[in-house]
Structures are given as C-alpha cells and as structure tokens.
C-alpha cells in the first residue's frame, strides 16, 4: 500500500476523530469547538548546529541547513522542518522560494492533507524537503486538534518503533 492510499484509509479514522465529540484514550469524552479559520504558513531559515560531526566518505560537517515551518490554525500551531543535506541538491534558497509561493490560506480544513499535497504538487514538482516540512506541520497540527499523538491515531506501540536515523553508503 502506498502512502496516499494509506492516508486515504487512515482518513476515515480522522473523520471520526475530528467529529464534535471524540473519546479520549484517557478520561471522559471531550467536546471540540467548531473551527472556522484558515491555514497560515510561516517559515524561517535556520542553521542547525549538530551535536556530533556528521561524517560521510566524501565529506564531514557540523551544521546543516534547515527551515523551520509553522502552520497556524485557530490558535494552534503545527511545526515542521525542512532539512537539506547538501548531497540531496536542495538548499535554503530553493525551499524558501517554494514555500513563499504557497498560499495555504485558501484551505480552511487542515485535515484535507491530500488536497494540500495535490496543491503543492501543482505549484512545482520536486521540492521534497519543502513539501515534507508542510506535511510534518499538518500532521503535528491535526494531532493537536485531536489531542492525540499520531502513534495513537494509527494504533501503534511506540516501544516497537524501529530506529530510523541511519545513513548507509
């Protein structure tokens, strides 16, 4: 199953989770207030200082370019990040140029993640770091709206999560 099909299937759960009354994993049901805002995207370039030197066969570095992304919706903020290792061919300039072309205020529902992805794809191809940063911020935001971390939304056990920060080559 590819990512889009998974998100479509998971979307059914999101619709249920975003209904006016949802059951919390702990405690009594909580009532969510109706939301009528627009999405507001902001971003800021950042030079991330690494705690340890990152070494590859051809290079070594102690910093990495980064763009911090925020999507605000009705007083809640979802955070994302575009990390651009030099060997992937993206830069702070390419990411900020792409993000500057986005107008997320046309969307009033942060749960419409697939539509937002389609919109981003229509703005320009590639730009994977920038698109990933928006995706991360949307998931952070919708998790906050549901008052649930995503591992719970997806029914995952965080103790069984594999390590994912490896570079092989």
Task: For each feature predicted by the language model, list its residue ranges.
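C-terminal segment of N-terminal export signals and the immediately downstream linker at the start
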Residues: 21-55, 62, 72
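Catalytic beta/alpha-barrel core
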Residues: 169
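N-terminal export signals
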Residues: 5-27
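Conserved N-terminal beta1-alpha1 strand-loop-helix module at the mouth
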Residues: 64-66
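Flexible hinge/switch segments at interdomain interfaces of large molecular machines
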Residues: 154-159
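N-terminal secretory signal peptides
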Residues: 1-2
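Metal- or metallocofactor-binding catalytic centers and their adjacent structured scaffolds
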Residues: 35-43, 72, 77-146
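Hydrophobic faces of well-ordered beta-strands that scaffold small-molecule active sites
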Residues: 162-166
């Amino acid at each position: 199953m590819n990512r889009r099909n998974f998100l479509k299937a998971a979307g059914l759960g999101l619709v249920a989770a975003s209904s006016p009354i949802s059951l919390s994993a702990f405690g009594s049901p909580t009532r969510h207030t109706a939301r009528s805002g627009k999405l507001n995207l902001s971003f800021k370039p950042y030079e991330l200082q690494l705690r340890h030197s990152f070494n590859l066969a051809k290079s070594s570095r102690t910093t990495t370019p980064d763009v911090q992304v925020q999507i605000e919706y009705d007083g809640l903020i979802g955070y994302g990040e575009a990390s651009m290792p030099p060997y992937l061919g993206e830069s702070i300039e390419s990411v900020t140029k792409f993000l500057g072309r986005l107008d997320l205020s046309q969307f009033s529902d942060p749960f419409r993640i697939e539509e937002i992805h389609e919109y981003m794809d229509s703005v320009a191809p590639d730009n994977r770091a920038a698109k990933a940063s928006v995706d991360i911020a949307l998931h952070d935001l919708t998790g906050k709206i549901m008052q649930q971390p995503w591992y719970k939304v997806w029914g995952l056990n965080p103790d069984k999560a594999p390590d994912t920060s490896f570079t092989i080559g």
